[in-house]
Structures are given as structure tokens and as C-alpha cells.
Design a protein with these regions (language model features):
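The feature marks the mature, well-folded catalytic cores of soluble enzymes
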Residues: 1-353
């Protein structure tokens, strides 16, 4: 019973028997409270069960962040390599329109879109870039894990905006990565109910993974395989991808899209040992469209980059419905669909058992 939603009487008439530690005429029987878990109470206290990335069930709610003129400040052009501007100069009008188009697609599919503000644009070392990126924190069963960035110093500080946002929507923060931990946990990939793929790279170290795993255990995550991602040193063309969601996407239960050029062998074996169908992304489509960076609406239904025609053909041949989205505007901001998306609520979905 949720008393806030179901009780309609006067306060003075509220039945004391609704308190689980109540015994007439005695102090609270506190030992009874030890049997009640956080997840048993989260919706009653916070108003929602939360959990956008704990599994692959039907997506119900996301947050997006509208890009602003801040993203085209001349400062970023002083050194494009340092500011990770791999492609053409950011076109703010195309980027804004891409967000509007994406939001319309989500809403047409029954997904609620919350628009998040990013008022803090200065971080630990100066102005921050990529403030419209939603996939830094992770929302699992019960609440959010707030990330600590490792890809670049100009991202150190975005967690303030996310912390304020979670407070504004009554989403509890379960943990903030701290100490010497680094973990851009929002790009972890849910594989099935209570199975989430982590990764190690410049964007996720051992300390960060250890912190995340301790939270996962209390939020009913049963397994966290860890991919070893590639890196960038001097040249974007020679480098790889430091986020696992750039090379791996789930399209259905036991069906994944991967770019094998940046997928480590242990993860390949992990999928094969569990009888996953692996759909390969062609090299040219990976570098042009990042088709593995997709958004799962529900098992067997995904949003993918429109230009990746061969990957889409292969995904459809595997029995998956694909909604195509023109991502050229997003790509002008050097990002894929999933990079800008913060899933907040999903239905329970299928597991691997």
C-alpha cells in the first residue's frame, strides 16, 4: 500500500496499523524495519520506482538536454583535437533541430521526454563543452549513480547539473563517483534484466568500477561483465573508442549489434557462450554513423541512425523493428543517439535465465 496515494481520510483517523513497526502501547519495534529493503519503499517515498538502465524492458521516460549557443563558442576552435571535435564544425541550428526531431520520435512511441537544464557551464578547470550530453549518469533500480569524467578535463563538473536535475525530479542519488574513481557510468550497456555491461578505459577505471559494483549489488544487478575499450593517443584516425556503447548495442534479448574492430575477445566469447546472435557493423558505417550507438525502445524495437543502411538491413533481417532517425545534426555535434539520452524509467524486461 502507498498511503500517500491511497489514503483519503482525515489525518487524525489514519490507521496506525499501517506502520510496520507498530504494536499498540509499545515503542516502535525497530527490528521489523530491517526486513524492509530500500527498493520496497522507493516509489512510496520518491514517487517513482526509477530505473532506466537496469534492463531492456519497455522504455517509458528519458531526459534530454537542449544544446545552446555555448557549444559553438570560438574557444572550442582554438584546438579542435583537444576539445574532441572529430568532425565538421558544430552547426548549432542543425543540432537543435536534431534534438527536436528526436524528441518527437520518442513521444510518438509513448516515451515521456523531460527537458533538463544545464545552467552551470564552468567546471573545475574552466568552461565545459558537450553540456547537452545526457549519457553520463546512470539510473538503475531505485535511483541514480552520478559519474566522474575521465575523457577530458573540460568535462569535470557536469555532474553538478545532473545532481540538480535529479533533485528537481525527486530521483534519489544512490552514489556519486569520488576518490580517485573515474566512471562515465551512463554509457554502460544493459544486456538483459539485471545484467549490465561495464567497461575499462580512460573513462572508467578500477576504482570507479569497484564503486559502481557495490551499488549494483544493492540494486539487484546480478552480473557486470567488463569490456576493455580502446583509446585515442595522438590521432583520431589511428585511435579507437573509449566508450563501450559506441561499439555495442542491444536490439533484442540475446541479439546485439557490434563493431568488432573495437570489441575485445573476452566480450565476444561472453556473448557466444550465452548463445547471442551477433550482428556486425561494417567498418565504413561505424566511422560515419556509429549505428551500435542506438536506443532500445523495447526488446525487438530500436531507434538507429538512418544512414547506416547495411547495418539496419542486417538488424531487420534478425527480426527487429528499426525506427530510422536522421542523425546528421547530432553527428555535427560529434555524438550518436544514445550519447545524448538519459533513460529514467523502463518496465521490467526479459532476463538471461
Amino acid at each position: 500500500m502507498d498511503p500517500r496515494k491511497q489514503y483519503e481520510g482525515h489525518l487524525k483517523d489514519y490507521p496506525l496499523t499501517n506502520y510496520p513497526d507498530y504494536e499498540p502501547g509499545h515503542p516502535p519495534r525497530s527490528e521489523r524495519l530491517e526486513k524492509i529493503g530500500f527498493l520496497d519503499e522507493v516509489e512510496k517515498i520518491w514517487g517513482s520506482r526509477w530505473g532506466g538502465s537496469g534492463g531492456i524492458g519497455r522504455l517509458r521516460e528519458v531526459a534530454l538536454i537542449k544544446p545552446t549557443e555555448h557549444e559553438v563558442d570560438p574557444l572550442w576552435e582554438k584546438d579542435r583535437n583537444f576539445f574532441l571535435l572529430r568532425r565538421v564544425r558544430v552547426d548549432i541550428d542543425r543540432l537543435k533541430q536534431a534534438f527536436e526531431d528526436y524528441a518527437q520520435v520518442l513521444e510518438s512511441l509513448g516515451v515521456r521526454v523531460r527537458w533538463m537544464e544545464a545552467p552551470q557551464s564552468w567546471g573545475a578547470y574552466g568552461p565545459m563543452r558537450k553540456l547537452f550530453m545526457g549519457a553520463f549518469p546512470l539510473v538503475i533500480k531505485g535511483g541514480a549513480i552520478v559519474s566522474r569524467q575521465g575523457q577530458a578535463s573540460f568535462m569535470r563538473g557536469v555532474e553538478v547539473n545532473f545532481t540538480k536535475f535529479f533533485a528537481s525530479i525527486n530521483c534519489p542519488i544512490l552514489h556519486t563517483i569520488h576518490g580517485h574513481g573515474i566512471c562515465e557510468v551512463g554509457v554502460f550497456v544493459p544486456i538483459a534484466e539485471d545484467v549490465i555491461m561495464g567497461f575499462k578505459s580512460c573513462a572508467s577505471n578500477d576504482d570507479g568500477l569497484e564503486q559502481v559494483l557495490s551499488v549494483f549489488k544493492r540494486s539487484e544487478v546480478k552480473e557486470m561483465p567488463v569490456a576493455h575499450s580502446t583509446t585515442i593517443i595522438d590521432d583520431f584516425e589511428a585511435g579507437g573508442e573509449f566508450h563501450v556503447d559506441m561499439v555495442l548495442g542491444v536490439v533484442d534479448i540475446r541479439k546485439v549489434v557490434v563493431y568488432p574492430g573495437y570489441l575485445d575477445y573476452n566480450i565476444y566469447r561472453w556473448f557466444k557462450d550465452r548463445e547471442f546472435q551477433i550482428i556486425e557493423v561494417p567498418k565504413d558505417e561505424h566511422h560515419k554513423f556509429y549505428p551500435a550507438n542506438l536506443v532500445l525502445i523495447e526488446p525487438g524495437k530500436v531507434i538507429m541512425a538512418k544512414g547506416a543502411t547495411e547495418t539496419i538491413r542486417r538488424v531487420r533481417a534478425a527480426g527487429v523493428e528499426v525506427i530510422e532517425l536522421d542523425t546528421t545534426g547530432l553527428m555535427a555535434g560529434t555524438n550518436g543517439i544514445r550519447c545524448v539520452t538519459l533513460p529514467l524509467v523502463r518496465d521490467p524486461g526479459p532476463g538471461l535465465d
